[in-house]
Amino acid sequence: KGYRRTQKGEAEMDESVKINKIAFIGGDMRQVRAINRISESGREVAVFGFNRDVIHKMDNSVVKAENIAAIPSDIRVFVLPLPYSMDGENIKAPFFDGTITISELLRATPPESVLLAGRADARLEALAEVYGIRLIDYFKREELMVLNAVPTAEGAIQLALEETPHTLCGSECLVTGYGRIGKILAHKLVLLGANVTVSARKPSDLAYVKAFGYNALNTENLRTVKRFDIVFNTIPKLIFDRELLMNTDTNTLIIDLASLPGGVDFDTAEKLGIYAVRALSLPGKCAPKTAGEIIKTTVFDIIKEVYR
């Protein structure tokens, strides 16, 4: 049975998560944290795709499979990394000395199993259907995206502090986009004393920007960013093209938080002498422990819904 902690710290049985056996295949330190937390909750966790150095950091009760075939045959929930693959062919396993092909994994996965993968694509969806496996992209879960925005925002602030010779307090900061990351980032910047402008397109977003006391700017009217010390882009489409970069001060730091292909023409920025940083996967880099907790929580939420 699983356990959860009450506010007073006592262990209390968690009856809502009915699946007690889970396998993790590959991943980084986020997965290691999630593995340990799920194991500590009283569940059986089997893993494959990690080297000995990383395995030694896992809970003693975790089942360390030598190969995919050695994963206990009664496990029906499999968790892949975020993202599940970097090339569409192999499972992302940075702590593994070999490779784990997606086809190899799916052939060994029992039909009607549940496969949780981060950033699942059309190829994985098609293969899962062929093998009769239920695929769920946990990166699309709202709770994960909202909670992940916190370490993303903090990681962006860390980058800004490292890459600028001045404090954030009193700095002119522009946040482009007012989605999950933009909302949390703008709030944290204001708390640090920055002068924050937020650009958005939707009238409702611009209304919220004003209501929270930020300077509002319609992204459609973004013609120059010369007055800003730091720009944080969260919009996953090309915003900072050649025309806008020509109207950007060379002392302005641009931090692109948007998923690929991103929102900055990096080649042009380099030619113009503008320092632009592509900051991807910040939760796993800056706060793997917290990011692992978020994955664990999301996995449990999905299991509760699937196995009611």
Give residue ranges: language-model regions.
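Short, Lys/Arg-enriched N-terminal segments with co-localized hydrophobic residues
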Residues: 1-12
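Glycine/serine-rich phosphate-binding loop and adjoining beta1-alpha1 elements at the start
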Residues: 14, 80-169, 298
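Glycine-rich adenosine-cofactor-binding loop
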Residues: 22-32, 169-189
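Residues in the short beta-alpha loop(s) of Rossmann-like NAD(P)-binding domains
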Residues: 28, 51, 121, 201-202, ...
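NAD(P)-binding Rossmann-fold cofactor-contacting core
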Residues: 42-57, 192-212
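Glycine-rich, highly charged phosphate/nucleotide-binding loops
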Residues: 58-70, 92-101
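Rossmann-like adenosine-cofactor binding region
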Residues: 65-66, 83-87, 101-112, 209-284
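Rossmann-fold NAD(P)-binding glycine/threonine-rich loop
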Residues: 119-136, 258-302
